[in-house]
């Protein structure tokens, strides 16, 4: 069985992914809370990605899969965003991920088959108003992932998932009533917004041996929003 580490897995996409992986893998979840995990076959490590240093002594010597799930959605007009907000988004989405990866690099190298899955946003490829901060932070993730995939091939693979708006606690303020849900669904060519399972299933595929010839790619799991013009 593979050892897979999820940073953030108590809610949303991370929780859906943990449920998907638990039966055929050893799943380790590092997150602030173990809420929602009691009935799952996973190991939990208390960890706050914004402040803590990951305790590798509580992890196996070999890590075969790594997923970094913390994210932010700060949508504001550019003129009203303070530089500190850009820095905070970059810190959470990119810098903290880099810190964790450098911490567990020996365990990833020990695997000889490790897979890394990172998260971007549809707003990187498709310019959207009010997305300057999140697009900048997630753009850093995409560039980093491709460079890392090149540097460490064939030791391990690195891929990115770029979702559109997905029904998770992080996106609740954008989907918390029927009107918002209808408008969001209408914006997508497939006429619905994403669900956590839509994204989790792609992540599970990228962590599996079924994707063994895929690396350095960005997958747009976004209901067609980034590429299809159907209206």
Placement of each model-derived feature along the sequence:
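Amphipathic alpha-helical dimer-interface segment in Rossmann-like NAD(P)H-dependent oxidoreductases
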Residues: 92-112, 149-150, 154
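Short, small/polar-rich loop/turn modules that mediate ligand/substrate recognition or access, typified
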Residues: 153-157, 214-216
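A conserved structural motif in NAD(P)-dependent oxidoreductases
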Residues: 188-199
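Catalytic loop of short-chain dehydrogenase/reductase
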Residues: 117-140, 145-153, 165-166
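Short C-terminal tail/terminal secondary-structure segment
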Residues: 215-231
